């Protein structure tokens, strides 16, 4: 491998700005801010808006969009009743 072309991979602390949840992970992203972690070491600090602690998919507070099909929209538009219900 060539030297000097690969980013430095290191441990960093990510903090979710909406919930103040912090976790330690590896990254090549750099930061001028640092934070002292639970193990006593100091790590670069990266702020994120959404993490697994605040994302609706992981928290179970997601909304399911109900998309009507083309046939349903046609029937609603022209006031037709469900063809399967009439049978």
From Swiss-Prot:
GO annotations of cellular component type: ribonucleoprotein complex; ribosome
A molecular function GO annotation: structural constituent of ribosome
Subunit structure: Part of the 50S ribosomal subunit.
SUPFAM superfamilies registered for this protein in UniProt: L28p-like
UniProt source species: Listeria welshimeri serovar 6b (strain ATCC 35897 / DSM 20650 / CCUG 15529 / CIP 8149 / NCTC 11857 / SLCC 5334 / V8)
Keyword terms, alphabetized: Ribonucleoprotein, Ribosomal protein
Family: Belongs to the bacterial ribosomal protein bL31 family. Type B subfamily.
Xref: HAMAP family: Ribosomal_bL31_2
One Gene Ontology term from the biological process aspect of the record: translation
UniProt superkingdom: Bacteria
Protein name as catalogued: Large ribosomal subunit protein bL31B
Pfam families: Ribosomal_L31
């Amino acid at each position: 491998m060539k030297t000097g072309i690969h980013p430095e991979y290191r441990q960093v602390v990510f903090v979710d700005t909406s919930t103040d949840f912090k976790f330690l992970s590896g990254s090549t992203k750099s930061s001028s801010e640092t934070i002292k972690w639970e193990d006593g070491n100091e790590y670069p600090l990266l702020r994120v808006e959404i993490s697994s602690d605040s994302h609706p998919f992981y928290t179970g507070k997601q909304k399911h969009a109900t998309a009507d099909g083309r046939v349903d929209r046609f029937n609603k538009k022209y006031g037709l009743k469900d063809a399967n219900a009439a049978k």
